[in-house]
Amino acid sequence: MQCPYCDHEDTKVIDSRLSEAKDAIRRRRECLACGKRFTTYERREPLRLMVLKRDGRREPFDREKLRAGLEKACAKQRVTGEQIDLIVDQIEAELRERRRHEVTSRRIGDMVLARLRRLDMVAYLRFASVYRQYTDVDQFRSELLRLAGSGMSKGG
């Protein structure tokens, strides 16, 4: 494994364990040249799944695109990279278990919102505003009132 700091080819594995979602092996490595440590993940082959978009287009499922959307929603919030990774891992595992070749972007969005709602309300609202295509303040207000009515207005 090549060191991301000095590009040296020789590294050693210090620790190896199963990820929280149990779909990857997390390895802590140390470069034998510069001594710096870094983490790698070993995952099974990517999920071969098509996402049906709102406009009728189909595109391959992309966990990195999902992760990027979560990172934007969670920016400057108390949500760690590990928590974002766990959400992505959980959603990918749930989609894999369905054993279907196609899923709607709406279904994926609903899965994300369900998890963000339990994690961070500001991130939830940010994601919902894009996913549900809010165009004015009244739509935000309605969502906030709905959340407050369900006792879920705390977070962030």
Swiss-Prot record:
SS bonds (residue pairs): none
Cofactor needs: Zn(2+)
Pfam families, per database record: ATP-cone, Zn_ribbon_NrdR
Entry's cofactor comment: Binds 1 zinc ion.
UniProt keyword Transcription, yes or no: yes
First and last residues of each zinc finger (unnamed): 3-34
Keywords of the record: ATP-binding, DNA-binding, Metal-binding, Nucleotide-binding, Repressor, Transcription, Transcription regulation, Zinc, Zinc-finger
HAMAP family per the UniProt record, alphabetical: NrdR
Function summary: Negatively regulates transcription of bacterial ribonucleotide reductase nrd genes and operons by binding to NrdR-boxes.
This protein's name: Transcriptional repressor NrdR
Taxonomy of the source species: Bacteria, Bacillati, Actinomycetota, Rubrobacteria, Rubrobacterales
Originating gene: nrdR
